Structures are given as C-alpha cells and as structure tokens.
Amino acid sequence: MNRLFRAVAVCLLAAVGVALAADDKPNPAATPRDSRLKQDYWKKRHESFVARAAKGDVDVLFLGDSITQGWEGAGKAVWADSFKGWKAANFGIGGDRTEDVLWRITGGKELNGIDPKLAVIMIGTNNVGSNSAEQIAGGVKAILDALHKAKPKTQVLLLGVFPRSGKPVPKDAAAATMLQPKIKQINDLISKFDDGKSVHYLDFGAKFLNDKGELPKALMPDYLHLSAAGYQIWADAIAKPVEALLKK
C-alpha cells in the first residue's frame, strides 16, 4: 500500500510540475519575432517603413498585416479619397502576426522619427490558426504597451479582428464565417483594453456580413482580404472616430 501511495504521489507531483512549466512558458504571440527578416520582400518593406519614419510628418499610422497593406492595393483609391487630409502612413505587411508587429515597433525601430497623433491597429488574424484567443489578446496587449512606452502621447484606435472564413465556397457565393467564434473570443478580450484615455476600441466587423451572417464575395473576394467596396466600409467606419481622436 505504501508503494502504491508513493507511486501515486510521485505521479501527482510530476503532473503539477508539468502544469507549472507550461504556465511558465512565454506567450509566443507576445514575444517579439524577427525571423521574417530572412524574407527579402518583408525585409525591404520593413526597411521602407524605417526610411519613411525618418522623414517624420505622420499624424495617423496604420499598423497591421496584409489587410492593412491592402490599402495600397484594392483600397488605394479609397485611401486617396478618404484619408487625404490626415498625413497618414501605411505600415502593414502581409502575413504579419502580433509578434512580428511587436518586433517592428521595438527591435525594428519603425517608430523612430515619427510622433503620430493616432495609431490605427488591426492585427491577429494570422495568429488564429496557431494561438489561443488568450495568447493573441496577450500579443495585442504587448503591442499596445510597447507603443505606449515608445510614444506615450499617441492615441490608439484598436480595431476588432475582421470576420473571415476558412472554407472555400462556389464562385460568387457567400461564405459562412467558420472562424467567427474564435474571432469573437479574441475581440471580447481585446475590447477590454479600451481605457477611454489612450486606447479606444472599435468593432465594425458586422458591417462586412450579409443578413445571414455570411461574408459576401463582393466585399471579401477570398473571404479574408477586402475588395475596394470592403475598404470603403472600413474608411466610413473609422472616419468620425479618427477625426475625434485627432482633436484630442
């Protein structure tokens, strides 16, 4: 009986040790990552941001992934028409995750030379497949903290992660938002970072959905990236909040 008791006790202690070790692991979504410097395209784009920042004169800074970068593609005309008076700069890179953006504004020094009045941040969709909602929210919080440390006077308009689908559908059909439950979890968590002072949360993802809660191809041709019409929805949704925050 004593042997059995000792064996059970050892197993329990081992299990507790494993659990504690797991809790001690750093959050990968909140750990700055510079491995994308090995990708020529990514490195060149990052370097272009550093060069742009060195010139200064940026009031509104957009930070994010390919959806943000798309302002230079499908959203180019909308950007030119909607943001012409904002002195805006687009620092979005396709494929970026929270940890990449975190490195860019810390080790990558992309903020050196600018003191934006406002940063518009939308990031996290590329983490959905490999991180928990809690980890992703932790990555977003790390970005907010790093940004505030570097630029304490910069206001932040934090956007909820946009809806998306992970399932291909027939041409011209609307797609069910398969990943929406997890995205809702993420958005529920990051919405709590709104402090009414320097961080302001805005979620307008529902504007991309039809009356069935599906993603129309006309707004998201691949059910992830926006069309020109999708970028118009984005521009319209942030126009008043941005104008208000620029006056703070």
What function would you assign to each model-found segment?
Residues M1-L63, I67-S82, K149, A244-K248:
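N-terminal secretory targeting modules
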Residues S48, F62, D96, D100, ...:
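Extracytoplasmic/secreted proteins, especially bacterial periplasmic and envelope-associated proteins
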Residues D59-G64, K87-G92, K117-I123, N127, ...:
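Structural recognition of the beta-strand scaffold that forms the well-ordered cores
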Residues T68, G95, A206:
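Short, glycine/acidic-enriched loop or turn micro-motifs at the edges of active sites
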Residues Q69-K84, T98-K141, A146, K153, ...:
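Oxyanion-hole/transition-state-stabilizing segment in secreted/luminal serine hydrolases
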Residues A88-I93, N126-A133, A176-T177, M220-A228:
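Second-shell loop/turn segments in exported
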Residues T106, G124, K141, D145-P152, ...:
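Sec-exported extracytoplasmic/periplasmic mature domains
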Residues P163-K248:
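Catalytic His-Asp segment of secreted/periplasmic serine-dependent ester chemistry enzymes
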